Amino acid sequence: MLILACLPIGDSRDASAHLIQSIQQVQYVAAEDSRKFARLCQDLNIKHNAKVISFFEGNESEKIEELTNLLKSQKDVLVATDAGAPGISDPGYRLIRAALQSNVEIKVLPGPSAVTTALLLSGLPTDRFCFEGFPPRTQGARAKWFEELAQQERTVIFFEAPHRITECLVDAGAAFGLDRSGAICREMSKHYEEVVRGSIAELITWAKSKEILGEITVVLAGFDPASRQIADEDLIKMVFELEEIGESRKEAIAQVAKKYAVAKRVVFDAMVTYKSEDKI
């Protein structure tokens, strides 16, 4: 059986009795960091006889065959990431797929999640939301990533490293608008937990004001269609006017998006819709 264990995201007291019992009884543990797993067991006074196998992003591909063979031989393997749920911006998904393809039974031990914890702490709408993992590390790719999310009407949740949070928020502000509401949740459930709520502009000011350490989850409000100040027809008209004076379609869309402080995707989609209606 493959056991996917949700571990505490900060406070070891959040570990369930079911998790503790499973660690005590399982034969193998695939741990993202064996030292952190050992520390958790020490904090919870868990004594176990499981063989701990290193299983992290760098060796995930090569370890899948070994772990799958154990599962196929009727051994129980518990997957333990550093915190939270396996497969959620952590190793696990490929092993889950391999286990299913081998007809191995899968069991999940529910528990803490940085995604839902941050969502609740943010004070933003919880009825519809999406989790986007980590933004790209390079500025160009990250800016495009945010542009594609700018018109997302669901609350958007993602992780970010502390040393990139300022530049990340700047790119988010450029795509979403600096007045979009959001929250930064840092070191959740730990002693130095901090939650900062406000507009993206205010979050940028906060990020620039101090040295930021620890694990960060960012929550941003979804796009409100009613907040758009300009109709699609006006965006399209401006694109045509720029094309008439020699600008390319791509450059015209970029200029219109900048002028009206909307994502390029909004202008592009308006043009596509216009074309699909045979007006171009």
Residue ranges with predicted function:
Residues 23-29, 103-107, 155-156:
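Short active-site oxyanion
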Residues 2, 76, 155, 162-280:
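A contiguous loop/helix-start segment that scaffolds small-molecule binding in enzyme catalytic cores
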Residues 64-113, 117:
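Glycine/small-residue-rich loop that forms an oxyanion/phosphate-binding "nest" at active or ligand-binding sites
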Residues 94-152:
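Class I SAM-dependent methyltransferase SAM-binding "motif I" and its flanking Rossmann-like core
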Residues 1-57:
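Glycine-rich, flexible N-terminal cofactor/catalytic loop recognition
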Residues 31, 108-111, 158, 184:
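General beta-strand structural signal in soluble alpha/beta enzymes
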Residues 54-61, 135-136:
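Conserved helicase motor
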Residues 35-37, 84-85, 114, 164:
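Alpha-helix capping/helix-boundary segments
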